[in-house]
Amino acid sequence: MTTSHQPQDRYKAVWLIFFVLGLGTLLPWNFFMTATKYFTNRLDVSQNVSSDTDQSCESTKALADPTVALPARSSLSAIFNNVMTLCAMLPLLVFTCLNSFLHQRISQSVRILGSLLAILLVFLVTAALVKVEMDALIFFVITMIKIVLINSFGAILQASLFGLAGVLPANYTAPIMSGQGLAGFFTSVAMICAIASGSELSESAFGYFITACAVVILAILCYLALPRTEFYRHYLQLNLAGPAEQETKLDLISKGEEPKGRREESGVPGPNSPPTNRNQSIKAILKSICVPALSVCFIFTVTIGLFPAVTAEVESSIAGTSPWKSYFIPVACFLNFNVFDWLGRSLTAVCMWPGQDSRWLPVLVASRIVFIPLLMLCNVKARHCGAQRHHFVFKHDAWFIAFMAAFAFSNGYLASLCMCFGPKKVKPAEAETAGNIMSFFLCLGLALGAVLSFLLRALV
């Protein structure tokens, strides 16, 4: 058995598998965030979501329009979003960083399958708890523990997938990014359907969690099928040295096992390598990928700084009392963003301009800073109740919709380009490590964006 020929990705099977895996990394967490109103409702001491029809209707309205106030908010409910952000971003950043350094010590299959199974278990528990009543404090603590677990395993899963895609051709990072973009689209559609149906918030949340479980199971099945494809085995073998052992290794790979000697043979320092050599290797990779790494960090810093902290606070100037008032944020903000973000991510499958060494790439990335004043000068409601804003420049809904479309498309396209280019700027043996480091900088951008969002919202 040899690898002298270069097999084709028959029926785009590997591309589709990575697409589903990308979908599986973000869809569960997106559904979790979409159900935020369900969690805050259960923490309100004066109401129970499932016991009062009128309050359920108010909850559904709140899902559509964040300005609708829920009665008698508890202190736990009031701090839920802030604590959720903290419990999400810190593990995401920490575990992505750890994965960048420790992926040589833990096999790829353990990291990916273990993470998917852990996320599946958390969502099964979350779905079951929808039907269980408990004290608000206990529910709050359990929810935060679940958020930490989801984002910890999600960070390991995402970084491992980008590292795995790094050993394949450059355009195989694109399906991961595209799948993640589609995850946002699905959750936006689910949110709009929940509003239109008028269903109770607890029922909508249960549907979100069960759907997330189904997607994770599909991702597990796809990952198990990946080693059976000749295309994947071929490119994985290219990262292994020692032609005399190729046949044995390919047999192991076909069974879904990772060759024991992969770490040492791939040129990536193993667990017993001197720390100095390992550090020098990582420093060399960082130097090679610094431009795409810093670019993807900057992209997500700007994006998360504005979306949704600022953009979700924009009000329609033409809705009045029409139904558009309830649908404005779900459609003009969330659905609009997720559709164009997905289109931008997907475009890299057929177009990768500018090139990985072009100066235009960092220039285009830096130019996205213009969206900060553009979106902040839209019809954003005042931070304090009763306060009036007088410095609207782009008050009409059309301005906001157009800016959001360009904002989202540039985010998806440029971020996907950077994630594709990063692993291709190093030797093939270092591609997996480069992919993990790129994932770390992506998560760093998310964390910095979360911090920036507080500042930008305070300035409105």
Swiss-Prot record:
It is found in: Basolateral cell membrane; Apical cell membrane; Cell membrane. Disruption phenotype: Knockout mice show an increase in extracellular inosine levels and consequently enhancement differentiation and thermogenic capacity of brown adipocytes. Knockout mice show an increased brown adipocyte tissue function and browning of white adipocyte tissue, and are resistant to diet-induced obesity. One of its GO terms (cellular component) is plasma membrane. Glycans are attached at N48. Keywords: Cell membrane, Glycoprotein, Membrane, Phosphoprotein, Transmembrane, Transmembrane helix, Transport. Residues 1-12, 108-111, 158-174, 228-291, 343-359, 418-435 are cytoplasmic. One of its GO terms (molecular function) is pyrimidine- and adenosine-specific:sodium symporter activity. PANTHER family: EQUILIBRATIVE NUCLEOSIDE TRANSPORTER, EQUILIBRATIVE NUCLEOSIDE TRANSPORTER 1. Belongs to the SLC29A/ENT transporter (TC 2.A.57) family. NCBIfam families: 2a57 (TIGR00939). This is Equilibrative nucleoside transporter 1. The gene is Slc29a1.
